[in-house]
Design a protein with these regions (language model features):
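Outer-membrane beta-barrel proteins
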Residues: 1-340
Length: 340
């Protein structure tokens, strides 16, 4: 028996539209918050520094209200450095037939991207300032439908699913958006939570699949992609240990595989001071180069420190990369200090 997923999607969305057919929103609250980050970064190896000073600032507008049918609505819009609108999100809770789950129309990130590196860190990931890591991202950056159930069947496991009908960020009403005509739907789901009967042990699993419609052309447009990741993190007292493995596979006319392992350890010296060591090993194999066994391993190592005093946080990062950007004999290093 063949099941037409597109028809099922249409039926599901039609039912959803019916359950969300409301007439008015009661008055709610609107607030504006912001953040500012000042940094100093010095690079070495293949890269040059230029001006080491940087600043990032962001404003977030949030609002909330309640519909006539009792469904709660929350909205969020971020405004970036260039004073341009960026990610937006509309979240519904209390939707009929969905129980405690939330439903969102969002471009604020995808479930699998949120767990791309869950090893414990004091300040920044090992790949934050050097190299270029191909990690799992799913439909991150695109506008889609997100379903989140924080506690599935009382198990403590969080279910987070995301569907993106083609690529592109949020567009105007009745408009469309797209990055590339070849990329179609993205489906992804993650499961995260505590491991039963083992205090301090957390787990996470995630999978993402992206379709491409150009199935017969001898180009990269005909290659579908799959991503998967799994992690374990254990904490006892101020000590945390973590390990993770991710795979990103693009197949079709050829196969490009990224196999990445993450390891990290952090220690909270006090309530205000934490330190961590992180390492990443990522291997790229490309069958289109004529050798299925060929691969370039990109390695990252970093030490980071975080100190908090009142509302201010100071972070320090010392990171190195070898075979950066999956290119042999290309090395980079970075030393950064950041105040938030």
């Amino acid at each position: 028996m063949e099941i037409n997923m597109k028809n099922i999607t249409k039926v599901g969305l039609s039912a959803l539209a019916g359950s969300l057919a409301f007439t008015a929103v009661h008055a709610g609250d609107v607030s504006i918050s912001g953040s500012m980050i000042a940094s100093y970064t010095k690079k070495g190896g293949k890269t040059t520094t230029g001006n080491p000073l940087g600043m990032n600032k962001e404003l977030t507008v949030t609002g909330s209200g309640e519909l006539d049918n009792g469904v709660s609505v929350a909205y969020k819009q971020t405004i970036t450095n260039a004073m341009g609108y960026n990610d937006s999100e509309l979240v519904f809770t209390g939707v009929p037939m969905l129980g405690d789950a939330t439903l969102a129309l969002t471009s604020t990130g995808s479930p699998i991207d949120a767990i791309d590196d869950k090893t414990p860190i004091a300040f920044e990931e090992a790949s934050a300032a050097v190299g270029s890591l191909k990690d799992v991202s799913g439909g991150n950056g695109a506008y889609g439908i997100r379903y989140t159930l924080a506690d599935a069947f009382g198990s403590g496991v969080k279910v987070d699913a995301f569907y993106t009908p083609g690529t592109g960020d949020a567009s105007a009403e009745k408009g469309v958006a797209g990055v590339t005509g070849s990329q179609e739907d993205t489906y992804e789901v993650t499961l995260t939570g505590a491991v039963p009967m083992v205090d301090g042990l957390e787990f996470g699993l995630g999978h993402s699949h992206t379709d491409h419609h150009n199935d017969t052309a001898d180009t990269a447009d005909s290659q579908d992609s799959d991503e998967g990741t799994a992690y374990l993190k254990y904490s006892i007292g101020g000590l945390s240990l973590g390990a993770q493995r991710s795979v990103d596979n693009t197949s079709g006319t050829g196969e490009v595989l990224y196999d990445t392992e993450y390891y990290g350890v952090s220690y909270a010296i006090s309530d205000n001071l934490s330190v961590s060591y992180n390492t990443i090993e990522s291997t790229k194999s490309d069958s289109t180069m004529g050798n299925d066994e060929s691969g370039t391993e990109q390695d990252f190592d970093s030490i980071s420190l975080s100190y908090t005093s009142g509302g201010m946080t100071i972070g320090i990062l010392d990171a190195d990369c070898s075979n950066c950007n999956y290119s042999n004999s290309v090395d980079e290093s970075a030393r950064a200090i950041q105040m938030t």
